[in-house]
């Protein structure tokens, strides 16, 4: 088993594709990505380093049945982590959003995961600068004007995705390896 676990929730399949691309680029140091609707709490807790990916739905929500998803996803999986101790774990987040059509909640669901893992004792790495994005609001921005993780816009900036992932992974490797 590798030391990095990649977990994602997806509604349209875009987050799954990005998770698979990240896995490919990590070249053997991460296990294959797991969809949270099929993952167990034990699998999640078995990794010292976690890469968590989510799209943002509706008004800045995690995917899940209550957000209108067809299947269980992050909303339901986070319930299984309510008492989990993530102390000693390192977490990095990536989120998908549409900064033009959902400008008022761009990648805001990343903040929900961020708050959850911080509250459970994890160390979060992989912040990303705000520059290069045009949106009106994101809950995923920290006070230092950086995102809590890597924001990706597959609708409007798909041509920047691979370069952003490469830069982000280089930063993560320095932080955790």
Swiss-Prot record:
- List, for all copies, the residue spans of the domain called Flavodoxin-like: 4-173
May I ask which residue range the UniProt record assigns to the signal sequence?
none
Keyword Transport in record = yes
Classification via PROSITE patterns: FLAVODOXIN, FLAVODOXIN_LIKE
Q: Which cofactor does it need?
A: FMN
The record, for InterPro entries, names: Flavdoxin-like, Flavodoxin, Flavodoxin/NO_synth, Flavodoxin_CS, Flavodoxin_lc, Flavoprotein-like_sf
Specify the domain of life of the species encoding this protein: Bacteria
Which Gene Ontology terms describe the biological processes this protein takes part in? nitrogen fixation
GO MF assignments:
electron transfer activity; FMN binding
The keyword Iron belongs to this UniProt entry's keyword annotation: no
For this UniProt record, the keywords arranged alphabetically read as follows: Electron transport, Flavoprotein, FMN, Nitrogen fixation, Plasmid, Transport
One protein family per Pfam: Flavodoxin_1
Q: Which family does it belong to?
A: Belongs to the flavodoxin family.
Role: Low-potential electron donor to a number of redox enzymes. NifF is the electron donor to nitrogenase.
Q: What is this protein called?
A: Flavodoxin
Gene of origin? Answer: nifF
